[in-house]
Amino acid sequence: MKAAFFDIDGTLVSFKTHTVSQSTVDAISQLRKNGVKVFIATGRPRPYIDNLGQLEYDGIISANGASCRMTDGTIVRNVLVDKSDLLRLTAYCHQHPMSVAFATEEQSFVNMLSPEFE
């Protein structure tokens, strides 16, 4: 096996503790020692990934595949929403009051708070 891909929620991170267990850290470490590249694969955008603790991995596929980066910073894939589409969407949300969240590689933005985003 050359590579292994792991989801975060319920796979690497416990639904009960919201943390990565020591046994998971140890197992991932052993994979890497055996020469297996370890990747995180998640639907979350990077700003929402904050609970991996001391887990070491080689790369991350985030935002449902829109962003793929190695831990050394190498960008493998980065799909951006076209600026004109983003402007049309924000105008629509302003005209029809609704919350929408956007995320970049470094930050997330919410146009207005609602119970869904609090």
Which residues does each PLM region occupy?
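Active-site phosphate-binding/coordination module
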Residues: 25-117
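Asp-based phosphoryl-transfer active-site loop
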Residues: 2-17, 42
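A short acidic/small-residue loop/turn micro-motif
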Residues: 20-21
